[in-house]
């Protein structure tokens, strides 16, 4: 074999248009050696990304569990893919029980997808569907070389193509036998009675009883069965990756209407004639009806689960609303209690105000004077509201307070004798306990009491307004004339609100 140069770098083994093996070799089976990583059940993948993710997840899980890889022998034939555990024979063991060494066996038409990892080209896997439970199972393997993994993937793809051709031949034979007559059609329906069926023909007959999950259903005349189409099985038929590796095998003849890596090719093409016995009551139509009923049942179960979930959600919302309503009622009750306490407090205050008003209105004239005098004594003297000619107060400790009160002469211009003056002064003198004690023993005389016209309801405002005016009064100079502290004439105070009351 000539060596490769830079002008002869083409390797036929990597050319997808050239088949790897002879079609007759698939009748006997083609064997490969690899290491079995593990298998796990996966949901039906919808994209290549999901398949690669499942492949890597299986690798990492088995590696984390410290499960060692097993050496196996992969046999690819028209009967399917068979994985046999590779184990050394003992010297005393003469019999070879293949059932004990068999790891798995999947027919070609049940294989869903075959590919290898883009990051590690030594890792490849295929997804097969279980016929009893319709569960997809991903089987991961590892080969010694990258080229070996590529050859295994392409061999499985070529096995699809060979089985598809054999199924077309078998369908054509059945169509030719149908033209001979009803008697010959019954005998030709299953082939020659004296000839034993080959592995490829057994695969093609199995498709009449069990179709692939992606098979396109043929509408039956006279039966109102819902038609539903499924997704494309070959994920690379939609969009292929531009990597250097090979995901699935491609048919060497592009003009042929087939998908090399898809199980759909096991069914007859649309251009070929329909197989006999496809009317009502055939196993294929019964299988389709059962499949439809199962899917309807699954749909009803899903709808029931959705309804139950909605009921649970409504119950949770109802419980939350009930809890919120109870909390709101508790808050309202607490507010009502607080309002009740406030109303009781307000009623108590109103009662006290009424009692004070009754006391103020029911007091005698002297009682009012005594109370007002007490207020005046505590707050200080109120300012005199008189004409501008009234002299300002002088120091209260002037010697004129004790000596010249009786002999004090009133000037002509003094406002004390006028009746139209705004303020009148009267003398209120607090006598000591013993009359014979002189005035000079330190007992102070009550200062001048200033009388102001006011109403009983305005006592508090007048009392509060005296604070600022008292400061102004204290700022006066002490050298001014002393204020008159005694009133010459004492008049009786009236009970009316407009009368003059001493403050």
Swiss-Prot record:
Coiled-coil stretches: 319-360
One example of the protein's molecular function in GO is: signaling adaptor activity
PDZ-binding (motif): residue ranges:
501-503
Q: Does the keyword Transmembrane helix apply?
A: no
Spell out the subcellular localization from the entry.
Answer: Cell projection, Filopodium; Cell projection, Podosome
Q: Which cysteines are joined by disulfide bonds?
A: none
Residues modified to Phosphoserine: 183, 187, 190, 262, 368, 371, 398, 414
Q: How does it assemble?
A: Interacts with the PDZ domain of NOS1 or the second PDZ domain of DLG4 through its C-terminus. Interacts with RASD1 and SYN1, SYN2 and SYN3 via its PID domain. Forms a ternary complex with NOS1 and RASD1. Forms a ternary complex with NOS1 and SYN1.
Query: To which species is this protein native?
Result: Rattus norvegicus (Rat)
Chain ranges of the PID domain = 26-191
Q: Which SUPFAM superfamilies match?
A: PH domain-like
UniProt gene name: Nos1ap
Name used for this protein in its record: Carboxyl-terminal PDZ ligand of neuronal nitric oxide synthase protein
């Amino acid at each position: 074999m000539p060596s490769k140069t830079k002008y002869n770098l083409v390797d036929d083994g990597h050319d997808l248009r050239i088949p790897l093996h002879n079609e007759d070799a698939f009748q006997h089976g083609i064997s490969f050696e690899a290491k079995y990583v593990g298998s796990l059940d996966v949901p039906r993948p919808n994209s290549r990304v999901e398949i690669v993710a499942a492949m890597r997840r299986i690798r990492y899980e088995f590696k984390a569990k410290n499960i060692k890889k097993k050496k196996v022998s992969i046999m690819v034939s028209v009967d399917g893919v068979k994985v046999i555990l590779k184990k050394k024979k003992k010297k005393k063991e003469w019999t070879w029980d293949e059932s004990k060494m068999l790891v798995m066996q999947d027919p070609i038409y049940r294989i869903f997808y075959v590919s290898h990892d883009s990051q590690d080209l030594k890792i490849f896997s295929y997804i097969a569907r279980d016929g009893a439970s319709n569960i997809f199972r991903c089987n991961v393997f590892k080969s010694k070389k990258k080229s070996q993994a590529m050859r295994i993937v392409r061999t499985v793809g070529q096995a699809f193509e060979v089985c598809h051709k054999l199924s077309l031949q078998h369908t054509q034979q059945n169509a030719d036998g149908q033209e001979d007559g009803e008697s010959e059609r019954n005998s030709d329906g299953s082939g020659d009675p004296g000839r034993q069926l080959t592995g490829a023909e057994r695969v093609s007959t199995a498709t009449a009883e069990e179709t692939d999950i992606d098979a396109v259903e043929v509408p039956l005349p006279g039966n109102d069965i819902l038609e539903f189409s499924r997704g494309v099985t070959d994920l690379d038929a939609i969009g292929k990756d531009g990597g250097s590796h090979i995901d699935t095998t491609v048919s060497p003849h592009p003009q042929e209407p087939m998908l090399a890596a898809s199980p759909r090719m096991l069914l007859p093409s649309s251009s070929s004639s329909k197989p006999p016995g496809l009317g009502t009551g055939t196993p294929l139509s019964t299988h389709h009806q059962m499949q439809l009923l199962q899917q309807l049942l699954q749909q009803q179960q899903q709808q029931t689960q959705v309804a139950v979930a909605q009921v649970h959600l409504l119950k949770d919302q109802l419980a939350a609303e009930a809890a919120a309503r109870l909390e709101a009622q508790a808050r309202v009750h607490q507010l009502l209690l607080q309002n009740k306490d406030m109303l009781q407090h307000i009623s108590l205050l109103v009662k006290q105000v009424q009692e004070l008003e009754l006391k103020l209105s029911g007091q005698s004239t002297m009682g009012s004077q005594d109370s007002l005098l007490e207020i005046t004594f505590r707050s200080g003297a109120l300012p005199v509201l008189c004409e501008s000619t009234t002299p300002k107060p002088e120091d209260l400790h002037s010697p004129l307070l004790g000596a010249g009160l009786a002999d004090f002469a009133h000037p002509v211009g003094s406002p004390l004798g006028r009746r139209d003056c705004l303020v009148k002064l009267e003398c209120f003198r607090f006598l000591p306990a013993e009359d014979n004690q002189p005035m000079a023993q330190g007992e102070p005389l009550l200062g001048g009491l200033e009388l102001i016209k006011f109403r009983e309801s305005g006592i508090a405002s007048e009392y509060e307004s005296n604070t600022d005016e008292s400061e102004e009064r204290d700022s006066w100079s002490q050298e001014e004339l002393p204020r008159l502290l005694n009133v010459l004439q004492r008049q009786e105070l009236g009970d009316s609100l407009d009368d003059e009351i001493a403050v």
